Amino acid sequence: MAKEIKYDMDARDLLKKGVDELANAVKVTLGPKGRNVIIEKKFGAPHITKDGVTVAKEVELTCPFENMGAQLVKEVASKTNDNAGDGTTTATVLAQSIIGVGLKNVTAGANPMDLKRGIDKAVAKVVESIANQAEAVGDKFEKIEHVAKISANGDEAIGKLIAEAMQRVKTEGVITVEEAKGTETTVDVVEGMQFDRGYISPYFVTDTEKMECQMENPYILIYDKKISVLKDLLPILEPTVQSGRPLLIIAEDIDSEALATLVVNRLRGSLKICAVKAPGFGDRRKAMLEDIAVLTGGTVISEEKGLKLEGATMDMLGTAEKITVDKDTTTIVNGAGDKEAIQARIGQIKIQMENTTSDYDKEKLQERLAKMAGGVAVLYVGAPSEVEMKEKKDRVDDALHATRAAIEEGTVPGGGVAYIRAIDALEGMKGDNEDETTGIEIVKRAIEEPLRQIVANAGKEGAVIVQKVKEGKGDFGYNARKDCFENLCEAGVIDPAKVTRVALENAASIAGMFLTTECVIAEKKEETPAMPPMNPGMGGGMGGMM
């Protein structure tokens, strides 16, 4: 395939056009008065969103050179989304500003490599300033609520729900977002350990209204193979019946004959019992059974350990305060496991999480960790229409990521003020030469841009408000929602420090690459020749046929 090559100014100008096309589409969403973007979908209703990265991912331009520029900025948005989960629009605005001002200087004769060095030095200084401004969240859940509210575009209800979910599952818990069946947005928290396996037979149900099997203070038998004959279970069943306590069997499967005997005894009332299949598959199943054993103070009866079912004793059984089994899930509340053993197991899972490179494995380990340590919360997002539900789900996802980022690295004043306060750190900073100093000035100008854009989206004049915020100190800034100047931290306008940091680092990284580009190569579109017109004498059919 033939290639088309552009050099120098021609190349950079075309790339810049692509950058502006994408950034202008994304930046209208910034701030509390940012607008929505409607994205056409090939099937179904159009997608309405205020999420920067969702908008960025949809942009594809026809000119290959312009499209490359757009893809570079798309990389800024998606990298920021991967690392911090939010701040994608801010990162895009910063990248556009650094590229725009940087390009003017390169055109005027500045050395791109020196400019990049100056930009990198300035960014390091701003990152340091952001870290100094950050305040730890700790157990202050009102801060989490504020962060979630700001990320969800000022939606107080979402802020409250996320704060409630965080409070109940703690930092190690898992929070997932799902679409609700109705119009209400609710949070559902599962205390204790839950896994996605229900009863093997509905005849084990104790509460016929809810179709659940509820067991108080039960014994728990954990076996990693199939139970084929009932006589293997007798050493456990007889003492259990004498104790009068219920028994939960977790096994790979139970043979139909053994299951029928258990069900008959359960219906006669001589045996309080329930059986469920083991969760997970393969090695993950072994790990999850071990988790359940540690949590309940039991032992996994496994031939790998030299243990057989017929030789099982009551010491090998786990116990818990309460177990609820429905057709899809089993929930174990307050397992009687040793606290130190549980902590050791949690530590082990954390080490595995650090060592794994697969995102899928990391997610599954995080789920196991949550079940051991905190709990699992599900946020059900409801809305009157599907289009609104998708838009709301985007905002909830953003808010959730932002709150996690806030817990990691603390919070800074929102509304672009953290960047404005970082300008002081760059005052009087000089590079090794004139072009490096220009690079520092470029960053100094660029970090005003998020505030300018928030103000522009609110319909005000950016320069005037930026100047007034610069004259203030500390948390003093412009609250675009209320259209007033106030202490932003007290007003609850706060951003996660991690999001603020990652947005600038990614924007500067891609902008630096952009400015040091001298040649761009794209595939040349081949002109496909038009089909020749058909000869009128070449009609179908055979001559003389009627």
Swiss-Prot record:
Identification of the protein by name: Chaperonin GroEL
UniProt keyword list: ATP-binding, Chaperone, Cytoplasm, Isomerase, Nucleotide-binding
Localization, UniProt: Cytoplasm
Keyword Cytoplasm recorded: yes
Source species: Parabacteroides distasonis (strain ATCC 8503 / DSM 20701 / CIP 104284 / JCM 5825 / NCTC 11152)
Gene Ontology cellular component list: cytoplasm
Pfam families to which the protein is assigned, alphabetical: Cpn60_TCP1 (PF00118)
Alphabetical list of PROSITE patterns matching this protein: CHAPERONINS_CPN60 (PS00296)
SUBUNIT field: Forms a cylinder of 14 subunits composed of two heptameric rings stacked back-to-back. Interacts with the co-chaperonin GroES.
Residue numbers binding ATP: T29, L30, G31, P32, K50, D86, G87, T88, T89, T90, G415, D495
Reaction(s) catalysed (UniProt annotation): ATP + H2O + a folded polypeptide = ADP + phosphate + an unfolded polypeptide
HAMAP family (UniProt xref): CH60
